[in-house]
Amino acid sequence: HWGLYAIPARGEWVRSVEEIKKEDYMRYFQEFDPVDYEPQKWARAAKEAGMKYMVLTSKHHDGFCLFDSQYTDFKSTNTKCGRDLVREFLEAGRAEGLKVGLYFSLLDWYHDDYPHFGDRNHPMRFNPEYPNEGRNFDNYLTYMHNQVRELCTNYGKLDILWFDFSYEDKYNVMRGEKWRATELVNMVRALQPEVIIDNRLEVSGEGFGSLWTGDPAPFHGDFVSPEQIIPPNGIQDKNGRDMVWEACVT
C-alpha cells in the first residue's frame, strides 16, 4: 500500500476516515514527489528475504493512479515526480526473477460518477451537499474497465491481479455484476491468460464468496483473501475441501 496517503501518513483510508473533501485532499497531489522511491531496492530485499512475488497498489480507493492512465489526470505522471511508478515497480520485480502483480481498487472516491452521499465508504457519505442525482455509474464502470484494460495491455505479463473490494450499504449492493464483473474477468483472462485473480469482485476480506459454496460464479476468482487474520488451520469450503487463500494483513 502506497500512494498520496503516504504524505499525511495516517493510512490509506485517511480520506474516508477523516471525511476529507476532494479539494482539501488535492494538496497532497500537489506535494507528491517520491524522490526516495527505489523499487529496485524493494525487489532486491524481497528476493533476499525469500519472497516469491510482489504486488503494488496501482490505484487505491482515493482514485490516485501510480500509472500513466490516459483516462484521468489524477496520476503520478502529472505530479512533481513525473514518473510511471507502476512500470518501475514491475520492471524491478521482474529483474530480480520475482512474480509481479497489481492491486486495483474497484472503489474510486475521486471519480464524480462514483456514489457519494449515503455510500458506506465514501468520504462524503454523510454530507448531503454531495447527492447522487446526476451521477452516472455506468460512466464510472466504463472508466474503471478501461483502466484495467490499460494495466493488462501496457505493462507486460501480470502474475496476480488483486481487485478490492465488494460491499453492501442501504442503497446499493456493490458486488458481482454491479461491477460488470463477468465482462471484466473475461477481458482480463483474454489479455492475461495466466494471471491469477482474487475473490473480491464478489466479497470483501470478511467472506469467501461462491468459491466456498462449490458452485462458483463466473467472476469468483482463483483464491480467497481473509483480511487481518492468518487462518491457523487453513480454509475449507462447505464440503471440507482445502481452499487456496492469501492473507491480507495491512
Feature map (PLM): residue ranges:
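Mature catalytic domains of secreted/periplasmic carbohydrate-active enzymes
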Residues: 1-250
